[in-house]
Amino acid sequence: MSAAPTDAKSVKLVVVGDGAVGKTCLLICYTTNEFPKDYVPTVFDNYMAPMTVDGEPINLGLWDTAGQEDYEQLRPLSYPNTDLFLLCFSVISRTSFNNISSKWLPEIKHYEPKCKMMVVGTKTDCRNDEAMIRKLADENQKPITTEEGEKLAKDIKAICYMECSALTRSGLNQVFDEAIHIVLNKNQSSKKSSKKCALL
């Protein structure tokens, strides 16, 4: 990352979703290239750094939020002036998937009615984890598919759907690259179907 001049455009991305879906891991892995060994709810400090995207200087701000109900009064304090919300769910948690439309969409729309959103499926490495698949099967469940994620994004009028794994870093950089480009209007993903923007 290179130093950005004072007139650089600011890009504010806010990550929301249920607790334990991997929001903090996403941010830590993206900014440090290291996967945290232990789960500690919301330990990531807001990350601000100058960088250059396609030759254009920007100041990138990444905001983590706590998904737990205990933080419902504090969480909205991070919402004002957000350029793009990343609504995250775990592909191995049907509850977190359902809560995107039943909880997180209404919450951010209440505070930021004209907000832009993208939907992000996390923990995609678990789709191939036999032990996890058996555990879900015991509960009469199965991992959320890419197609389900795409449909969710379309149903809630999100700009696009993408998915990634913080553990393997598969798709991780692409999620944030896409988010930054959406804010900077460098691509036309908002004019395409969510399927065009989905990352397999």
UniProtKB/Swiss-Prot annotation:
Subcellular location: Cell membrane; Cytoplasm, Cytoskeleton; Cytoplasm
Reactions it catalyzes: GTP + H2O = GDP + phosphate + H(+)
Top-level class of the enzyme under EC nomenclature: hydrolase
CDD domains linked: Rho (cd00157)
Positions of S-geranylgeranyl cysteine lipidation: C197
Protein name: Rho-related protein racD
Location, primary (coarse class): membrane
Entry EC number(s): 3.6.5.2
GO biological process, one term: regulation of actin cytoskeleton organization
Family, as annotated: Belongs to the small GTPase superfamily. Rho family.
Cofactor(s) the record lists: Mg(2+)
Record InterPro entries: P-loop_NTPase, Small_GTP-bd, Small_GTPase, Small_GTPase_Rho
Organism annotation: Entamoeba histolytica (strain ATCC 30459 / HM-1:IMSS / ABRM)
Motif (Switch 2): 64-82
Binding site for GTP: A20, G22, K23, T24, C25, Y39, T42, K123, D125, A166
